[in-house]
Amino acid sequence: MSRQLSRARPATVLGAMEMGRRMDAPTSAAVTRAFLERGHTEIDTAFLYSDGQSETILGGLGLRMGSSDCRVKIATKANPWIGNSLKPDSVRSQLETSLKRLQCPRVDLFYLHAPDHSAPVEETLRACHQLHQEGKFVELGLSNYAAWEVAEICTLCKSNGWILPTVYQGMYSATTRQVETELFPCLRHFGLRFYAYNPLAGGLLTGKYKYEDKDGKQPVGRFFGTQWAEIYRNHFWKEHHFEGIALVEKALQAAYGASAPSMTSAALRWMYHHSQLQGAHGDAVILGMSSLEQLEQNLAAAEEGPLEPAVVDAFNQAWHLFAHECPNYFI
């Protein structure tokens, strides 16, 4: 659905997943500096990212995160994967390890990265409340939970007097809109803001890939050569997705001619101006990158204006082409 220009623009968050993986420490420092110099303040990492190197690199930047007078806000996440769980001991261990890596006394936002169906959710939430009371984090967030789980968690927290979640981080882009149907109404009801990850559908909405690329040898990246590549291909690498992207590229040429914005720019402008994100609610877009140049391009696109109506219509057509294959927003 198209939105008016007058609405408040969603915030921008720096996604630090590639720090320590495709970006070394000096590049990560340059990226962070460039992001902060544009006036943005929120950084998103996780216990899991780059086997802890993302947090360690951020901790070594001297940002004094977690101090009362620091304008930089840091978020991290505890996960139920690779030998971890969301049982109380593991949640505590992960958060305390993250604080050591980040060299800060507390984080501004602490997420449960995904549901742990082997751990009673009441125990997890009680542990989070205890950690909050100890001053180890300010806000509680959820990521990759189903709408009914969000409702259950909010109800449990309210009835027990525990800290309530205030942020949900989920997958959302111009061609992956499953969150709009039931999750967004749930979040609005319970007062959670929404932070969108994968706004470029894992990079597919850059337009640099072709469907046939999967059959040949490709350089290491989001879709090839990493431990996450198969997951991303299973999520996004569908023939209908590429057909939808071609529709948008055609509409861009028809609407703008020789001055047509890039596919990346168009996809990000859709997020900021035509999605269901609302800056007035505190919603945000998480921008990831694997280089300083990529970040600067994405930040520039995020500052541009709305798209021509014909391009917005083409994105809607692309979504309807791919909707039946859209990956679930929950795990």
Curated annotation (Swiss-Prot):
NADP(+) binds at residues 44, 143-144, 169, 198-208, 222, 290-298. The active site is at Y49 (proton donor). Its EC number is 1.-.-.-. InterPro entries: AKR_Detox_Biosynth (IPR050523), NADP_OxRdtase_dom (IPR023210), NADP_OxRdtase_dom_sf (IPR036812). GO terms for molecular function: aldo-keto reductase (NADPH) activity. It comes from the Eukaryota. One of its GO terms (cellular component) is cytosol. Mainly expressed in uterus. The record marks K77 as: Lowers pKa of active site Tyr. The modification Phosphoserine is found at S85. Belongs to the aldo/keto reductase family. Aldo/keto reductase 2 subfamily. Can reduce the dialdehyde protein-binding form of aflatoxin B1 (AFB1) to the non-binding AFB1 dialcohol. May be involved in protection of liver against the toxic and carcinogenic effects of AFB1, a potent hepatocarcinogen. PANTHER family: NAD(P)-LINKED OXIDOREDUCTASE SUPERFAMILY PROTEIN, NADH-SPECIFIC METHYLGLYOXAL REDUCTASE-RELATED. This is Aflatoxin B1 aldehyde reductase member 4.
